[in-house]
A protein has these predicted regions:
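N-terminal secretory targeting signals
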Residues: 1-37, 41-49, 79, 267, ...
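Short alpha-helical segments used as structural interaction elements across diverse proteins
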Residues: 1-2, 62, 223, 258
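Intrinsically disordered, low-complexity segments enriched in polar/charged residues with Gly/Pro
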Residues: 3, 25-28, 71, 84-85, ...
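Hydrophobic alpha-helical segments and their boundary regions
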Residues: 4, 8, 31, 35, ...
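Hydrophobic alpha-helical segments, especially transmembrane helices
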Residues: 5-6, 66, 247
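Active-site-adjacent loops and short helices of periplasmic peptidoglycan-processing enzymes
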Residues: 24-172, 176-185, 243
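Domain-terminus/edge residues, biased toward the C-terminal soluble/receptor-binding domains
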Residues: 151-155, 163-276
Length: 276
């Protein structure tokens, strides 16, 4: 009897030690971040895998253009081959710009592609005016589409993300919007371009390269999304990658180490899901 109890006790202690060892081995520490607000989301399940200040109101800078793209696709997805009208107001935007001119002949799709690759503020205004009639009306459409995508704490007042009082979003909201958009092939196609030849019909097409070094650096599986910077917002990045059919998205707002951290957080997310 004593021997049996001793054997059972040893077996129990061994099981406890083994369980603790397995639990410890399974834990994967998240990366550190200097970002003010960061969210890592599993785009397939919408599960938040890491969050730092996820609901803090932040200046989104040009990550706003992701919402502009999604709104245009939702409202005009079947009419992108129409020629866009270029207003003098659009051409007066502060940099960065695509470089459209009044009188240019270019389709709405061409403007959208150029907006995402060059992060063109002028192109964003062209999109807004041609989709909804004005920047103000388009902003209302942006907020409606963002809400549909799962945003709860965002207010978009312009299509480009230049600093404007009251224009704000959160890392969580931007992650939800990005995950929503990545379900659609047309959206995925337009957030993943490294180069783009702007198809002007009245002048020589111009080849431009993305401002997104995450895409340019060829991270394995990289497929988007958008950069951003203003003095008020700091350096921002929404980065997405897909491996073995599994998509991870990280949102980093006011993060001076955004390029390195994008790689670290996406690697972390894939490791958590057992994806190599």
């Amino acid at each position: 009897m004593i021997l049996k109890r001793l054997i059972l006790m040893i077996a129990f202690i061994g099981a406890v030690i083994l369980g603790a060892s397995i639990s410890h081995a399974a834990y994967i520490a998240p990366p550190s971040t200097v970002g003010e607000a960061v969210v890592l989301i599993d785009a397939d399940t919408k599960e938040i895998l890491f969050a730092k200040n996820p609901d803090k109101w932040m200046h989104p800078a040009s990550t706003t253009k992701m919402v502009t793209l999604l709104t245009a696709l939702e409202l005009k997805g079947t009419q992108l081959d129409e020629l866009a009208t270029i207003s003098s107001y659009a051409t007066s935007m502060e940099e960065s710009n695509l470089g459209v001119r009044v009188g240019d002949q270019i389709t709405l799709e061409g403007v959208l592609e150029g907006m995402m690759v060059a992060s063109g503020n002028d192109a964003a205004v062209v999109v807004a005016e041609n989709v909804s009639g004005s920047v103000e009306k388009f902003a209302k459409d942006m907020n409606r589409v963002a809400s549909k995508a799962g945003a709860k704490n965002s207010v978009f007042l312009n299509p480009h993300g230049l600093t404007q009082m009251g224009h704000h979003s959160t890392a969580r909201d931007l992650a939800m919007i990005a995950a929503y958009g990545m379900k659609y092939q047309m959206f995925r196609d337009k957030v993943a371009n490294d180069y783009y030849k702007v198809p002007y019909q009245n002048r020589t097409p111009e080849t431009i390269r993305t401002t997104n070094h995450f895409i340019r650096n060829k991270y394995p599986g990289a497929n988007g999304l958008k950069t951003g910077f203003t003095n008020a917002a700091g350096e921002c990045l929404i980065a997405s990658a897909t491996r073995n059919g599994h998509t991870m998205i990280v949102v980093m707002l006011n993060d001076d180490n955004r390029w390195d951290e994008a790689v670290q957080f996406l690697d972390y997310g894939f490791k958590l899901r057992g994806v190599i």
